[in-house]
């Protein structure tokens, strides 16, 4: 009897163990299936995103087709389409219609930028522009004389930068760029390429600030595809995480993480001084004032010597063009009157239209965007004075023209404070 009881107990335990083992197997099988499903979904989404955003082959095919038909011409055309000396590298695109790739052109490292669209919007920004479109490479038309093309360029630039005493000099600069083979003549294909490029803020800025150290040099173009020199370190700060991880990290923690991966403080101070110098260059510059409407870290980078470079100038817009576009913008509240990331005006509620004057100058928005970057790691004896000056800078209101003396005083005080601190250090 005892033996029977023992057998039944042993069988019961064996059955219980087998049932538990089956449950564990099913559980792990389900978890394995779930992991495979999630991984496959992530890979699919990443691949779909990549194929949607990264269309370099399509861009090259369109440009080279136009070049082979004699519609466009430019200094980069033969290297891109005939000699295969201009190579597309890593995709950096964030929007399907604005292709950005690292590139190699002979012994030069560059960044290739190409607009993928059947129609090209005048570039103040699609969200602000009236519905004004041109078919790409339609202008100038066959039979247009060089003198007529010059008038077209002058009229367009006047609308962008306003009436300038030296507008003719800017027109001459544009025509010099248009003459890509430097033979002293502008062909119709060269003129079509130049006209398409002239609609882009970044190209206009590159011409206006050519020779200045804080904007990448324009290396060449073909149609509306253009190549600028590559900036070694970009974005200015922060880390790039896979988007599933990025979704789960709180915004405050993300900002702190971004500040962990930055150069030493003297080098950060030198980079910030470069930003102040860039603001000086575009405030009452040779060809008018410009507004920097995206002060995020992704818009900037720096060289191996820690000199600041503007890496994305699409949201740097001539102040005159900004004003003209804003007064055409309808609004219901102040939030409707924003261009780019941070250029704001107010809403005239009685007229339901945005006002023309920007709420804060470039300097105030730069100080606000870079405050945490600059204060983190600052020498203890400097922190109080630096913070005080940064907050005074952030308090600037209205356009720089309205408070020119205060603007210049704050900018020079910040530069002096930082240079005095880092001028004797090897890091700077």
From Swiss-Prot:
Identify the keywords attached in UniProt to this record, alphabetized: Disulfide bond, Endoplasmic reticulum, Membrane, Signal-anchor, Transmembrane, Transmembrane helix
Q: Name one Pfam family in it.
A: PIP49_C
PTM entry text: Among the many cysteines in the lumenal domain, most are probably involved in disulfide bonds.
Instruction: Give the matching SMART domains.
Output: PIP49_N
Question: Can you say where in the cell this protein is located?
Answer: Endoplasmic reticulum membrane
Transmembrane regions listed in the UniProt entry: 28-48
Q: Its topology with respect to the membrane? A: Single-pass type II membrane protein
Instruction: Write down the superkingdom of origin.
Output: Eukaryota
**What PANTHER family would the database entry show?**
DIVERGENT PROTEIN KINASE DOMAIN 1A (PTHR21093:SF8), DIVERGENT PROTEIN KINASE DOMAIN 1C-RELATED (PTHR21093)
Identify its protein family: Belongs to the DIPK family.
Q: What is this protein's name?
A: Divergent protein kinase domain 1A
What taxonomic lineage is listed for the species of origin?
A: Eukaryota, Metazoa, Chordata, Craniata, Vertebrata
